[in-house]
């Protein structure tokens, strides 16, 4: 057998042995249920006697049974280590959980599917409104009176009107006369 295959087989055997060993020690998790500002803990172990509860290593008086119901839960006061245990003689069997929960009176629980549905519906409504405005403005543009091309401000047509002479030019911008030799009458040639 080649060395590479031997190492693979040995690694596979170690993984299988580790998985079997882990199954024997695996503990069931606590069940935690939060509704409004009430928190309910369910002890995962099946004890034969009466189950007692501790919070931060202090006995909780009046709380016995598989379920612990904490009403008016406060994150500041009630967060910490919770332990369900049973005492048999002088031997104690316990199961511990650290709990830190935020609760509120008027909260609503929303799952992922509801959030996705809300987002998709929002996008569809937005696109629908966008198309509605687009087609409304397009139909409005088609109904509007057509504008003649080249019409300027005031509805005056451009170009030469045969019934009226052209406007008198502004004297400030009078063209330079050919016979006049003023300073700015022409361009001077510079010596190169």
Curated annotation (Swiss-Prot):
Record field: transmembrane: 115-135
Topological domain ranges for the Extracellular compartment: 23-114
Cytoplasmic face residues: 136-192
Gene Ontology process terms (BP): adaptive immune response; cell surface receptor signaling pathway; positive thymic T cell selection
S-S bonds: 43-84
Role according to the record: Part of the TCR-CD3 complex present on T-lymphocyte cell surface that plays an essential role in adaptive immune response. When antigen presenting cells (APCs) activate T-cell receptor (TCR), TCR-mediated signals are transmitted across the cell membrane by the CD3 chains CD3D, CD3E, CD3G and CD3Z. All CD3 chains contain immunoreceptor tyrosine-based activation motifs (ITAMs) in their cytoplasmic domain. Upon TCR engagement, these motifs become phosphorylated by Src family protein tyrosine kinases LCK and FYN, resulting in the activation of downstream signaling pathways.
Organism (species): Bos taurus (Bovine)
Glycosylated residue positions: 72
Boundaries of every ITAM domain copy: 163-190
Location within or outside the cell: Cell membrane
Residue span of region Proline-rich sequence: 164-171
Name of the protein: T-cell surface glycoprotein CD3 epsilon chain
């Amino acid at each position: 057998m080649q060395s590479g295959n031997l190492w693979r087989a040995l690694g596979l055997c170690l993984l299988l042995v580790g998985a079997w060993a882990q199954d024997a020690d695996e503990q069931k998790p606590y069940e935690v249920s939060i509704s409004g500002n009430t928190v309910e803990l369910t002890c995962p172990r099946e004890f034969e006697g009466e189950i007692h509860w501790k919070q931060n290593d202090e006995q909780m008086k009046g709380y016995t049974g598989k379920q612990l119901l904490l009403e008016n839960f406060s994150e500041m006061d009630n967060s910490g280590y919770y332990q369900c245990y049973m005492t048999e003689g002088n031997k104690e069997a316990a199961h511990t959980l650290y709990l830190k929960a935020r609760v509120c009176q008027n909260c609503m629980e929303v799952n992922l599917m509801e959030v996705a549905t809300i987002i998709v519906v929002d996008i569809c409504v937005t696109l629908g409104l966008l198309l509605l405005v687009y087609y409304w403005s397009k139909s409005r543009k088609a109904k509007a009176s057509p504008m003649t091309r080249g019409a300027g401000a005031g509805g005056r047509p451009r170009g030469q009107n045969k019934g009226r002479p052209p406007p008198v030019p502004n004297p400030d911008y009078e063209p330079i006369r050919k016979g006049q030799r003023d300073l700015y009458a022409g361009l001077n040639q510079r010596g190169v």
